[in-house]
C-alpha cells in the first residue's frame, strides 16, 4: 500500500465519520448529549397514524403546555386551516380587527384577557367543519391545527391556534424533505410565555407533507392521531447498533493501513541503512576500472571486498549504470550489491528504497533474506 493509498483511505474514513455525525445530528440522535439548558423542558413526542401504521417524530416547544406522561397516549383530531389553499402558515391576520393585538418589533403581543375569553371557543370558519356541524364533546380528544413554518414566529402560530379554540398546534418544517432535523421552538425575547396554554409540536418536512396529504384526502374529516411522549435521543444505541458493522470494518481497515504504514517505514529504513553501509568505489579511469582505483569503505562487516580484474568486470557487469543508463566516468562513486552488480550510489539507493527491493539486473533480493 503506497502513501497515496494510505492518505486516500484516511480521508475516506474521516469523510465517513463526518457523514455518520451529520446523519446522527440530522435525526436528532445526539440531541440529548448536546442539548442546551434552555431547551431542557422540550421533549420529543411520537405521533402515530393508525390508518398507515406509521410513527412520526415531533418535538415539543419550550413554551406552552407539554406532554409529560410517558405512559399515557393522547388522542388528537388534526385539522387544516380554513384558508389552507392560500396560506398554511397559521399566522394571525394583521387586518383582523376582531382580535386586540398590536405589533412591536415585528412580534405580536396579544391582549391576554381577550385570549382567555376566546381560547376555548373556536371560530367555525377557522377549521374544517365536522359532519354534524358541532364541536367535539369528548374531553379525551384534543383538536390540533396543522400549520407550516414561516411568516411569523412559532409563538405567534401557537397563540393564534389557541385564540381559534384549538387545544394544540403542529408546525411543519418548510425545508428540504430530505432533512429530518427537528427544531426547538422558542418564544421571542421579552414575550410572556405564559400566554400560551396549549402544546405545540414541530415535525419535519416529510412528516408535514404526509399529514397534509392525509388531511386533503380525509373528505373533510379530521385526521386521527395518537401522541405519546418519547425521547428521540433513545435512538442513539439502535443507531449505533445499526452502523456498528460498518464502524467495525472502518476501524479494521484503519488498523491494517496503520500497520502496513509502520511495516513499510521500518522496511525502507532498514533498506536505506543497508545501502548506506555498502562499500563505495571511485572510478579512476573512464569506461573501466584500473588496478590503482581508489577504494573507500572497502570493508563490509569487517571483511575485505575482493576486486575483479578489468576484463571480467567489463564482460560481466558492464561499464554503465543500468538505472540511469549513463556510463561510469572518472570520479563516479559506485556501490556493488551482494550480487556484485554495481550502480551509482544515488541511483541504486532510490531504486531499492522507493521502487523495488531487488537488483535491477538480476532480481536478487536486497537486502538478502536472513537464513533460517
Curated annotation (Swiss-Prot):
List of residues that carry Phosphoserine: 280
InterPro entries, A to Z: PA_dom_sf, PA_domain, RING_finger_E3_ligase, Znf_RING, Znf_RING/FYVE/PHD
The keyword Zinc belongs to this UniProt entry's keyword annotation: yes
Main localization (coarse): Golgi
Gene3D superfamilies hit by this protein: 3.50.30.30, Zinc/RING finger domain, C3HC4 (zinc finger)
Signal sequence annotation: 1-24
GO CC field: cytoplasm; fungal-type vacuole; Golgi apparatus; Golgi membrane; vacuolar membrane
GO terms, biological process: ubiquitin-dependent protein catabolic process
An MF annotation (GO) of this entry: zinc ion binding
Zinc finger map (RING-type): 321-363
Domain PA: 92-215
Membrane topology, as annotated: Single-pass membrane protein
Record-given protein name: Uncharacterized RING finger protein C57A7.09
Originating organism: Schizosaccharomyces pombe (strain 972 / ATCC 24843) (Fission yeast)
